[in-house]
Amino acid sequence: MARRKHYHVYVIELSQDVLHEGRFRRCNPNYIPGKPCVYVGMTGLDPDVRFDKHKAGIQSNRYVREYGLRLLPDLYEAFNPMSYDEARDKEVEVGIDLRGAGFGVWQA
């Protein structure tokens, strides 16, 4: 029996203030000023629920908790839902693609 495809990749816009974090800047040497800064993740939850959990500090990434502004569904909705393995691979692929476009990207 095939497993239900219920995993999601999601992208959260981060405030430009995240650029004051040295670790974020070091991980994004090809960042193009003016491009968005984002967090890319994957979850078995609805992306809206996962974003709310990040902001509430529940299993959250510090950059999302402190700098997260909103979800960017135009960058991920076409992919979802998918299997765990597909989501794991797609999360990496989306991060690489966005970095290649000059975005500042954080992935846990």
Model-derived regions: residue spans:
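Aromatic/basic micro-patches that form nucleic-acid/chromatin recognition or nuclease catalytic surfaces
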Residues: L45-D48, D52-A108
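GIY-YIG nuclease catalytic motif and its immediate N-terminal context
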Residues: M1-D52, Y84-V94
